[in-house]
């Protein structure tokens, strides 16, 4: 499973670890992803989404039906 938020599209980015001597070694910054079940009242069922913490805040703000409508227009499976 790819490390991509289904709501916000957040994905891993690359950067550097920096030691005290400012030596750089490559690293990845991973999104804070969770598999979470959301109850969809209109469909009377649970939907499991892989969302970041910010994605959960977006769902709290907009509502799950609105977010699922956006996913459908993008052609994403859920």
From Swiss-Prot:
InterPro entries: Ribosomal_bL28, Ribosomal_bL28/bL31-like_sf, Ribosomal_bL28_bact-type, Ribosomal_bL28_sf. The keyword Transit peptide does not apply. Pfam families: Ribosomal_L28 (PF00830). Residues 1-21 are annotated as: Disordered. Keywords: Ribonucleoprotein, Ribosomal protein. GO terms for molecular function: structural constituent of ribosome. GO terms for biological process: translation. GO terms for cellular component: cytosolic large ribosomal subunit. Belongs to the bacterial ribosomal protein bL28 family. This is Large ribosomal subunit protein bL28. It comes from Serratia proteamaculans (strain 568). The gene is rpmB.
